[in-house]
Amino acid sequence: MRVGGRFEVISPHEPAGDQPAAIDELQRRILAGERDVVLLGATGTGKSATTAWLIERLQRPTLVMAPNKTLAAQLANELRGMLPHNAVEYFVSYYDYYQPEAYIAQTDTYIEKDSSINDDVERLRHSATSSLLSRRDVVVVASVSCIYGLGTPQSYLDRSVELAVSNEVPRDGLLRLLVDVQYTRNDLSFTRGSFRVRGDTVEIIPSYEELAVRIEFFGDEIEALYYLHPLTGEVIRQVDSLRIFPATHYVAGPERMAQAISAIEEELAERLAEFERQGKLLEAQRLRMRTNYDIEMMRQVGFCSGIENYSRHIDGRGPGTPPATLLDYFPEDFLLVIDESHVTVPQIGGMYEGDMSRKRNLVEYGFRLPSACDNRPLTWEEFADRIGQTVYLSATPGPYELSQSGGEFVEQVIRPTGLVDPKVVVKPTKGQIDDLIGEIRKRANADQRVLVTTLTKKMAEDLTDYLLEMGIRVRYLHSEVDTLRRVELLRQLRLGDYDVLVGINLLREGLDLPEVSLVAILDADKEGFLRSARSLIQTIGRAARNVSGEVHMYADTITDSMTEAIDETERRRAKQIAYNNANGIDPQPLRKKIADILDQVYREADDTDTVQVGGSGRNVSRGRRAQSEPVRSVSVGVFEGRDTAGMPRAELADLIKDLTAQMMAAASDLQFELAARFRDEIADLKKELRGMDAAGLK
């Protein structure tokens, strides 16, 4: 039963610029029953704020899809700021590292599934599903992870434990219920997903909460329910009732599990018979051993590693039927908002086949039952069947969105701040690097930042090396930098730790960098994906948040894509300038707080334990840097600027040797936790060393 709550925007600002007209028109179209609506919103016009005001008008649960974790985190924080009294949740993949199970037949190589789960993100995923099943005023900001299989909402709800003061619940019966839904008893280490018992008091940290729950019994009657701080035990608030949701999304009752095991055994027998008929005895033995082990684990503890591969049987679905996903947790009238739709829509459509090609190999060679193929992302057709009314947000809507809306769109190109689209200057390629260096120095002297986008990784590396030699504080952003490191890198750019960021295809959608006053596009006349009109407009938008923003395109000819991008930018400039003149607006620079956009989403515990490195007295800290520590962070995954904080390659290599010796010594002394910490530091430093080698840095 979902509790009704009203969406309420709390903001010091009122809709301005194009926002009032856009909100009115979006509301009108949705209330008129239009299934697909496109909002063409230029960079910096406040599309996120428009989304929040639209949600307030419509009063409907909303799923906001973003193309990656970084933009999803940015959106979630913006919406949380505007909807502070409502549930704004964050749902992305909870893997920090993920190596999927695979089999390479050509080399007879089996790759076991290996992953590292981010505990905070897993909690946020559970928080999203529990909120969706218990209230209506919910906005979930999600990546494409929301189309992957999840346990069914009915099982998740049915297996939840409802508690209320004065209810008769035997204490031991409650403990058994908690164990059945994968909570573990641990009276020593009190962590998320565990519970502890002290006489007539049971304390639980639910899988979706930061706070603990205390249940006080008087005999078999619940006497009181509290939320408390798990570390200090301080009572935060007392409640009359609450519901404890399972610790995993894959839960089933004893009857359902017994039926699932029976169905798995039946499928196993059929598949073994098929393998034996074909003379594939190795595959048959492989499948028999693995599946029987998993069945035994499910019988004994109700769970096994890789249980998601049996989700079809656990859910009671037929062969080929789609799995339950986050979409199934929403009520029927939910609104879908797809941010950066020109990227997100193709992404949704491409997930199924990539997943399926890997699983077919596992099934064919006896590593998995055929039903494992039904643990998969939705196809585009299945996704389209599950969604209702959709708002597509983009500065450059794609062909699919425009075809769905009949070519019509709602336009939002005027910025309330009065900021004008950047001036686009086309320059010849002859002497382009010298010209670029001159422009960089001019911006650096004015405490402004520069983005440079190239076509190839090699060119980006060479340019970074050259700029370093010229004494410019520069770093290079590439595809191997993981999401959280990328966020830290962008934050350092804003803080002024360096002046120039060189990239390839990473400086586009959604990057919010008000300090950037120049975007340089090298080889702008090379037609292709990275220099299409849509890509150029997105790249130009990175300079649209600065009063003196400019875009320099280095090219010898002006292509059709360049013409289209420049004309569209000029059209938007003219419209904004006319609005500013009519309303007496003097464009003001954006003053956005420089903070890690993931701070509110990832509440990582600060690990300020230090590791002494050799005799140099240098302290290297894992996790976030303590306030008192030097600025240098270990292995940010990019090339460090060659300033005094940077470490030469030879010194870095010596440091790795030093740490390796200390790791071995710690292991010999049976100090395994310390040794593990050394091991992690060494892995980070080796990654940085490889990066330096790739860049040719000494």
UniProtKB/Swiss-Prot annotation:
UniProt: ATP binding residues: 41-48
Provide the Helicase ATP-binding domain boundaries: 28-414
Q: Which keywords describe this protein according to UniProt?
A: ATP-binding, Cytoplasm, DNA damage, DNA excision, DNA repair, Excision nuclease, Nucleotide-binding, SOS response
Question: Which parts of the sequence are annotated with region: Disordered?
Answer: 609-629
Q: Quote the subcellular location field of this record.
A: Cytoplasm
Query: Motif Beta-hairpin: residue span?
Result: 94-117
According to the UniProt entry, its GO molecular function terms are:
ATP binding; ATP hydrolysis activity; DNA binding; excinuclease ABC activity
Q: Name a GO CC annotation attached to this entry.
A: cytoplasm
A Pfam family: ResIII
State the protein's purpose.
The UvrABC repair system catalyzes the recognition and processing of DNA lesions. A damage recognition complex composed of 2 UvrA and 2 UvrB subunits scans DNA for abnormalities. Upon binding of the UvrA(2)B(2) complex to a putative damaged site, the DNA wraps around one UvrB monomer. DNA wrap is dependent on ATP binding by UvrB and probably causes local melting of the DNA helix, facilitating insertion of UvrB beta-hairpin between the DNA strands. Then UvrB probes one DNA strand for the presence of a lesion.
Quote the subunit structure annotation: Forms a heterotetramer with UvrA during the search for lesions. Interacts with UvrC in an incision complex.
Swiss-Prot/TrEMBL domain comment: The beta-hairpin motif is involved in DNA binding.
PANTHER family per the UniProt record, alphabetical: UVRABC SYSTEM PROTEIN B (PTHR24029:SF0)
Q: Which family does it belong to?
A: Belongs to the UvrB family.
Q: Which protein are we looking at?
A: UvrABC system protein B
Protein source organism:
Mycobacterium leprae (strain TN)
What's the name of its gene? uvrB
